[in-house]
């Protein structure tokens, strides 16, 4: 199985280079001020200019207003990852307004019934991202994971990706259980919240290549 990887929360040239040279298929930038990984669109633009065209540039946004969406599109993003409480109606508006941008919707998962949320976004988004539900102000990047067995044999109605508590040590098990073909890692390649580690990025991507 060929598994692709999104390294999320990149904020420096050094960690960006580690992700690119070790084979990341997607690079994620966080535009949420409460996150320790937050970057301004202007900084993201400088980093995006260093990324080869074949790698997707995804912006993580939490209930963004139209002005922020315009700014991050101008920075060069190819996709939005909506990680807040965006309703299907709001997502439909974003889709109409930015027809060339790929849209992901992050869905917090605790139990099997949570997977039904996917149906509300069918036809509106290009991909859903299954992530662990968090208790705090941050919707993701907390190192928490959900029960991967919930995805075993699940009939996915659209393209999807797996996130939540992934690292180099558990990625093989996560993919074996879920069948994920795209995985998303953030805290699992950090030494502290928001501090990406080049060696951990390389180790994670090497572990994915060995699957």
Swiss-Prot record:
Catalytic reactions of this protein: N-(5-phospho-beta-D-ribosyl)anthranilate = 1-(2-carboxyphenylamino)-1-deoxy-D-ribulose 5-phosphate
Top-level EC class: isomerase
Enzyme Commission code(s) on record: 5.3.1.24
Pathway annotation from the record: Amino-acid biosynthesis; L-tryptophan biosynthesis; L-tryptophan from chorismate: step 3/5
Entry-linked CDD domains: PRAI (cd00405)
UniProt keywords, alphabetically: Amino-acid biosynthesis, Aromatic amino acid biosynthesis, Isomerase, Tryptophan biosynthesis
MF GO annotations: phosphoribosylanthranilate isomerase activity
Signal peptide residues on this chain, from the entry's feature table: none
InterPro entries listed in its UniProt record: Aldolase_TIM (IPR013785), PRAI_dom (IPR001240), RibuloseP-bd_barrel (IPR011060), TrpF_fam (IPR044643)
Source superkingdom: Bacteria
GO biological process, one term: L-tryptophan biosynthetic process
PANTHER family: N-(5'-PHOSPHORIBOSYL)ANTHRANILATE ISOMERASE
HAMAP family (UniProt xref): PRAI (MF_00135)
NCBIfam families for the chain: PRK01222.1-1
Family: Belongs to the TrpF family.
Protein's recorded name: N-(5'-phosphoribosyl)anthranilate isomerase
Organism whose genome encodes this protein: Zymomonas mobilis subsp. pomaceae (strain ATCC 29192 / DSM 22645 / JCM 10191 / CCUG 17912 / NBRC 13757 / NCIMB 11200 / NRRL B-4491 / Barker I)
Record lineage: Bacteria, Pseudomonadati, Pseudomonadota, Alphaproteobacteria, Sphingomonadales
Gene: trpF
């Amino acid at each position: 199985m060929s598994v692709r990887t999104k390294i999320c929360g990149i904020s420096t040239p050094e960690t960006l280079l580690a992700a690119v040279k070790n084979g990341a298929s997607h690079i994620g930038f966080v535009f949420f001020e409460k996150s320790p990984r937050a970057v301004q669109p202007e900084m993201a633009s400088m980093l995006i200019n260093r990324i080869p065209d074949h790698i997707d540039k995804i912006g993580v946004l939490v209930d963004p207003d139209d002005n922020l969406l315009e700014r991050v599109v101008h920075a060069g993003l190819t996709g939005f990852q909506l990680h807040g409480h965006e309703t299907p109606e709001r997502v439909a508006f974003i889709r109409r307004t930015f027809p060339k941008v790929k849209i992901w919707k992050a869905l917090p998962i605790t139990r099997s019934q949570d997977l039904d949320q996917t149906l509300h976004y069918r036809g509106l988004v290009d991909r859903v991202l299954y992530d662990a539900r968090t208790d705090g102000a941050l919707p993701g990047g907390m190192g928490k994971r959900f029960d991967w067995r919930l995805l075993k044999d699940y009939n996915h109605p659209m393209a999807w990706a797996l996130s939540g508590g992934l690292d180099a040590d558990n990625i093989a098990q996560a993919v074996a259980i879920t069948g994920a073909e795209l995985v998303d890692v953030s805290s699992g390649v950090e030494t502290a919240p928001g501090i990406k580690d080049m060696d951990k990025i390389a180790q994670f991507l090497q572990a994915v290549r060995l699957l």
